[in-house]
Design a protein with these regions (language model features):
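Conserved alpha/beta-hydrolase catalytic His-Asp/Glu region
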Residues: 135-192
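Gly/Ala-rich beta-loop-alpha elbow adjacent to hydrolase catalytic centers
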Residues: 83, 87, 91
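Catalytic histidine-centered segment of alpha/beta-hydrolase-like enzymes
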Residues: 236-245, 249
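Alpha/beta-hydrolase fold catalytic core
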Residues: 1-15, 36-39, 76-77, 225, ...
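Conserved HGGG/HGGXW glycine-rich cap/lid loop of the alpha/beta-hydrolase fold
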Residues: 7-53
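Conserved serine/cysteine hydrolase catalytic core
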Residues: 170-224, 229-232
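Flexible "cap/lid" loop of the alpha/beta hydrolase fold
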Residues: 93-96, 103-137
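Conserved acidic catalytic loop of the alpha/beta-hydrolase fold
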Residues: 62-79
């Protein structure tokens, strides 16, 4: 069986970090680095992302099993888990399906609910960039950014997305498997099973300016994660760990050291 790509920093109690859609293990580097002073930080590339294997299936029970396979490979019996966005859903699914592996759970700006499709322009833009790279109409990151700007207005979002571009033997290509992600997108937006629950310590961290977690979601969250609490980072959007890194890391450390 294929194993996800992972990176280990530091020593101590294991802490597993799981990135969001179109990301890679590097995206949580600003969390991994300081946490590695006190923890064995295991950063994961989700399938179809980063340097991990490609598969045309991204349902959450399977994505959770992928991470558990890494822990089994490393002989890690229990860990703290932190996931952002899609990675938060994967971390929640691990807690729901494999609770004995989970010492505690930290979920960054996502709820276990179904979300409406809202990445279509991003997917379309990235696929157009990929097509023009294949046709050798795009040969530089600058050209890729210019084309993507017709689909994605915000420069920082484009910069994040284009971190997926890499060069091998002088040829640009995407590390993430765009077609699989596009095919599996409905699965990624799905809710987790509301009939499952995890009674362990759980922290939800919400960006104050983000609408990914709302007050109404507590009606779904509480029965599934009865021992959960929430922290809000004022002024932070969905990318709360990147926008307010010091505040985010303090909340994480305080929770882990409780």
């Amino acid at each position: 069986m294929s194993l996800l790509n992972f990176q280990i920093r530091g020593e101590g109690q294991p802490l597993v970090l799981i990135h969001g859609l179109f990301g890679s293990l590097d995206n949580l580097g600003m969390v991994a680095k300081p946490m590695a002073e006190d923890y064995q930080v295991i950063s994961i590339d989700v399938c179809n992302h980063g340097s991990s294997f490609h598969r045309n299936d991204m349902n959450y029970p399977t994505l959770a099993q992928d991470v558990i396979s890494v822990l089994d490979h490393l002989n890690v019996k229990q860990a703290d888990f932190l996931g952002h966005s899609m990675g938060g859903k994967i971390a929640m699914q691990i807690a729901l399906s494999f609770s004995h592996y989970v010492k505690s759970l930290i979920v960054a700006d996502i709820a276990p609910i179904a979300y409406p499709a809202h990445h279509q322009e991003i997917i379309n833009g990235l696929q157009q960039v990929e097509l023009q790279i294949v046709n050798q109409q795009i040969t530089s990151r600058k050209q890729a950014d210019e084309l993507l700007s017709h689909y994605v207005e915000t420069p920082s979002v484009r910069q994040f997305l284009l971190r997926n571009l890499t060069t091998t033997d002088g040829q640009l290509h995407f590390k993430c498997h765009l077609q699989n992600i596009a095919n599996c997108y409905p699965q990624i937006m799905q809710a987790l099973d509301p009939n499952q629950s995890f009674s362990g310590d759980t922290l939800f961290i919400k960006g104050g300016a983000s609408n990914y977690i709302t007050a109404e979601h507590s009606e779904v969250i509480k029965p599934m994660f009865p021992n959960s609490r929430a922290k809000i980072i004022a002024g932070a959007g969905h990318w709360l760990h990147a926008e307010k890194t010091v505040a985010f890391n303090k909340i994480v450390k305080d929770f882990l050291n409780r």
